Amino acid sequence: MTERFEVTTGIQKALSMKSEVFGMLLDGTPSEPSISKESVHHLSKIVSGKPLVRPAWFLDTNQQGEGIVDVTTHLVDLVQWEAFPGQIIDRSDIKIISSKRWTTSLAPDQFKNITGLDSYPEYLQKDVKSDTLNIYCNGEINYTIKGKHAKVSVIWDYKAPEGTGDTHHSVMRGSKSDLIIKQGEAENYKPTLYVISKEGENFESNLEKALESIQGEYPGIEADKISDSKWKILIPEVLKIGHEAHFGQVTDNFLKYYKDGQLPVWEVPNMITKYYTTTQAYKKALKK
């Protein structure tokens, strides 16, 4: 799971484990979940300086799967990994409240730009209406995990506005602070972690101590005070290695587990629960 190695996510998790800064994870509500993850992706994009050519089957949900059971897998994984670190999560700990799925539409010229093909293959005809390809690549899941309200959503647009790219938005709500990752225009479309305090007294010094305690893993990080209750976490560029490099880190982790001959005790049961969450949400969304 590559996003476990994204530096802002790692620091968000680390700070959520500092009770003097974060407090306890709130129970949340469906409208204001205790933890939420949203990612926006684009079918047409530039990767490593070159236009990405996707195979046509990538747009066939019978072969690729729908969005609600695809990228959401990563987001559900992060919810489990951050909210309940090192804990075994059983399927009985999951309650699906609501879920939905919807399409992204592609015109023939957009399809050609993505795949290089002049026409839709036969296996995509089932999703074509009035010459427009409609793909169920978007999904949203509202659920509880061990009694805490969570929400994950994935959106696939055709193409990002000029100068932007895929984005990630994440919120963890605690009794003492909220930990929020934003990646919008104000952040120059770069993942940025904010800490928003709910308590005034000693919070700043507690935050500084917490950051000092994780310098070994995240050397050079600092807190930039924006207001009396809001800080931006400054992260050295050397720690921002980029999404493609995370695949190497995942591989290193796998090879370590392979050498040791075992995974962490929580990894396999949580993997089962992760896929249970996405598939149950998919089944629920199909009933609408």
Where are the language model's segments positioned?
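Predominantly a Rossmann-like dinucleotide-binding segment in NAD(P)-dependent oxidoreductases
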Residues: T2-S130, F254
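C-terminal helical cap and adjacent loop that interface with cofactors, partners, or active-site loops
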Residues: D70, L75-Q80, Q87, S92, ...
